[in-house]
Amino acid sequence: MLDIAINHIEELKKAMTRTWFQEKYKFYNYDEYYRDLNIEDETWNVHQFVSLDKDGNVIGYIDYSVNRQTYNCSNLGIINFSDNKIIFGMDVGQVLRDIFEKFKFNKLAFSVVIGNPIEKSYDKMISKYGGRIVGIYEKETKLIDGEYYDVKLYEITRESYLESKK
């Protein structure tokens, strides 16, 4: 179940800091540096959500930036703190539906560090919703293992998303 992140600040921040320096989460962080998660008290520039299990525990976090001038979304962040892929996956799907159907944003652009286990799922999602792989930045980011990684860029337009739903 989705809820706004501001309602779960303490539990969410604890879950996020537990991921610091963990090999399993190195791709989410996208960097060698960690900082405390900033939960905004407004939704003008960013939408922030938590995924909750049936008992109301935070099992994941989903956010994206909003450009109000272009009505485009970017910087999609998705992290699952649990092994509950079913509920979390349904919540990610709800966020995608909301971006294009509820909020009627124009486009979603996001990226993934190549090698991240979620990359294949993103490729399938892009194909399912009529999006595209925009390109690849070579050696774009350095992770906690000291290695440089390529980054794949994606985009889905509202038009292609709605067309895929027919």
Go through each PLM region and give its residues.
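Active-site rim helix/loop that mediates acceptor-substrate recognition in acyltransferases
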Residues: 26-49, 53
